[in-house]
Amino acid sequence: MEHPKVSVIVPIYNVEKYLDECMLSLLNQTLEDIEIILVDDESPDNCPKMCDEYANKDKRVKVVHKKNGGLGFARNSGLDVATGEYVAFIDSDDFIDLDMMEHLYNVATEYNADEVRCGIKFYVGGKFTERHDVDKLTVFRGKEQVVDFMLDVVGPLPKCKRDVKYMMSSCCCIHSRKVIEDNHIRFLSERECLSEDLIWDIDLFSKMNCVVYVPECHYAYRMNPSSLTHQYSREKYQRNYNFFEILEEKLAGILAKEKYELHLLRSQMLYFRNSISGFVHNNGNVKDDVRYVLNDNFWKRLFSLYPFKRLPLKQRVYYTLAKLKSPTLMIILAKLK
């Protein structure tokens, strides 16, 4: 198998409990012409041995053992050895429908797409909740349409009822490896940048000519409260600053400020709400942490810039109450969500 249709890159760290379920969904894909690259990020459990066992049983499986460096750098290590026409990223505690790769690859071929993405279904307590961002196959063709899509991934315009119009994820898609390699695109470290996926999306979309979105929810995202993405701290909160600095720098490099500003501000507003929610649902001194966010000058500037009157009623009420800077009130609102 010299050049498979899809290289599936799976970063692995401390997921012994879930790895078999993930791998079963990959090894049994209806599209057999794939390679599966397992990147062991110096996992402290039995995962390194499990990876080697998978490689011994199936020639489509490659294993990379590396020093621990985090999710973004593990994905980069997978990219360095990938040979497929397209690349997919799957988190090792998640799993996918058995026909996901075949469906996305066939669509990519039919539309000559640089990326094809699908919907996500959230998996918790043995039950699925699907999220549909499109209700039919949707094609974004040409630089202008792809950039408009990219901006809606960053954040929707004020009139949009959803805080997230299109899910930001590198996992529910296949990406052209040629676009990635021709433009030397790689992930930042999530240890420095709060959302390496969104920065990756911008780097990619700015170089793409066709993105296709299918409505089927092929990707099962495991809602694991103890996982890295569900832990919140002031250190993680501080990474907001670095993230938004990088995000605006990326956007300013390809667009005029008036084109991206409202999208960026809406994204920042969502991170404000998520920061409040993160502290409320974390163990710690909740009231002090929420007060810490409310008194941050970063949000004061945001509140002075954004046209709140153009928001849907629910969001307008929330941010009006946030201006009162009452930790107790914001804690109540977060718990009601």
Model-derived segments and their meaning:
Residues 4-7, 25, 35, 199:
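Cell-envelope/extracellular polymer assembly enzymes that use nucleotide-activated donors
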Residues 113, 279-337:
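Membrane-interface aromatic/basic loop that binds lipid-linked glycans or pyrophosphate carriers
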Residues 216-224, 230-257, 273-302:
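Catalytic core of nucleotide-sugar-dependent glycosyltransferases
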Residues 66-82:
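Glycine-rich, basic loop-to-helix element that forms the pyrophosphate-binding segment
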Residues 71, 92-212, 219-232:
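Donor-binding/catalytic cores of nucleotide-activated saccharide
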Residues 14-28:
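Short, well-formed alpha-helical segments that are part of the catalytic scaffolds
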Residues 87:
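Short aromatic/hydrophobic "clamp" motif used to bind/position activated sugar donors
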